[in-house]
Amino acid sequence: MNFFIKSCFLDKEKTDCIVVSVFELSELSDSAIYLDKCSNGHITSLIKLGDIQGKIGDTLMLYKVPKILSKRILLVGCGKKDEINIIRFKKILKNTIHAIKKKSIKNIVYSFSNINIDNIYWMIRRMVLSLKESLYETIKINNTNIKNTNIHSITLNIIKKNDLFIAKTALKHALAIDHAITSTKNLSNLPPNICNPLYLSYKAQELSKKYENNIVVEIIDIKKMKELGMNAYIAVGNGSKNKPFMSVIKYSGNNIVNKKIIAFVGKGLTFDSGGISIKPALHMHEMKYDMCGAAAVYGTLIMAAELQLPLTVIGILSGCENMVGSHSFRPGDVLTTMSGQTVEILNTDAEGRLVLCDSLTYLERFSPDIVIDVATLTGACVTALGESVSGLFSNNEELSNQLLHASQETDDKIWSLPLFSEYHKELNSNIADFSNIGRGKAGAITAACFLSKFTKKYNWAHLDIAGTAWKSGKKSGATGRPVELLCQFLLNQSNYIYN
């Protein structure tokens, strides 16, 4: 499916369907008014019949409108003009796709005027990403009857010709971000018998082939991990026949404008049984999503390469599998991490932080200025923030504010939580430097406190996406979060101007 940007006369467009907005009390948008005048009031006469009120959720398909070359016009209700926000706008777009999917419509022109949710850049970007999200379908394994959408092209009509350049920039960014989100979803949704740590390393190596001028990949296998002293990482994978692999993706842009080295680390537990501290059977199948952090980092690096961002970005996919076996690590073990710090294991289901701590230490060799780890780390974060908001922790206020700003821009909600010294005390151990879980409450915070002990040499932030990375139930599947937020963070670091 292709997207296009242009400024056109709607009555002259030979297309299958033109989509225009109608507000409450049957108030027409400027685009609808233009088509109404061209058709000698045909649209107004039909609206007077009362088939559409302009409320959000309303749609009305018109056929063979006089003096209009398009085969159809879809009127879509947008509610009250001054009450449209990002959430309602996404719902409006979803309603249009729902109405169009029922028809054999291949080519569409959207002409949304009088919707002032933001400047033209953000309006176009939100439109493209929302439409793409509405059209996304999970790939079924070995399904020969894949039903793709009938839609071949979507054209976004720009009312003011002066806005064409920025609109085309928005489209370029949106398509790259969608590529990142879709790649993240597709990888996250794979079953664990396909997507194991070795498979993650293959996916990383594919990037170095596709973007050979900008991306170099190094794979750290268990032999190299042993040489590096990554004992915590290794211990987590000891119970599985699928050995751990850490994929290091190095992206170097052309004409770099920001000299900072930015690094992302993604938790890549391709399946987490909990180990000896085994999880309950109910919902254990969803633990294939415990690698969504790594998938998000993978997707974000794709966007950087697609847009040729003028940055240096490192992405680590910390691939591992936590299984029960005769070689599994145990509660009571004491592990010496790559940093030299020792950890008492109180719970083998608190394994993600053990993989991440050695990955965070490994990153020191690159002298990064910014490190952001992304992990489905704790159920406690889901308890605290629910399934709509990710947890944010950081040792640097400026970095925290930059991520919060990107969150507001993308409507990918995050919430900052503290790392007070009182929480660190919960990790005290009598036999090691600290334990791998807290002995009290605030599990999301104590997990972040654990990670912070390995991030003293750079500015660091931790995103706990345990509640937001996937959805359960009838419409289960990966959400692709927080990829757009991370992409926006990189765009902001690239000093892009959107107005």
UniProtKB/Swiss-Prot annotation:
Enzyme nomenclature, EC number: 3.4.11.1, 3.4.11.10
Q: Name one GO molecular function term.
A: manganese ion binding
Any idea which residues are catalytic in this one?
279, 353
Listed binding positions for Mn(2+) 2 are: 267, 272, 290, 351
- Give the reaction(s) catalysed: Release of an N-terminal amino acid, Xaa-|-Yaa-, in which Xaa is preferably Leu, but may be other amino acids including Pro although not Arg or Lys, and Yaa may be Pro. Amino acid amides and methyl esters are also readily hydrolyzed, but rates on arylamides are exceedingly low; Release of an N-terminal amino acid, preferentially leucine, but not glutamic or aspartic acids
Which GO BP terms sit in this record?
Answer: proteolysis
Q: Which UniProt keywords apply?
A: Aminopeptidase, Cytoplasm, Hydrolase, Manganese, Metal-binding, Protease
Which superkingdom?
A: Bacteria
Question: Where located?
Answer: Cytoplasm
Which of this chain's residues are annotated to bind Mn(2+) 1?
Answer: 272, 349, 351
Q: How is the cofactor bound?
A: Binds 2 manganese ions per subunit.
Q: Which cysteines are joined by disulfide bonds?
A: none
Cofactor(s) needed: Mn(2+)
Q: What does this protein do?
A: Presumably involved in the processing and regular turnover of intracellular proteins. Catalyzes the removal of unsubstituted N-terminal amino acids from various peptides.
**Matching NCBIfam families:** PRK00913.1-4
Protein's UniProt name:
Probable cytosol aminopeptidase
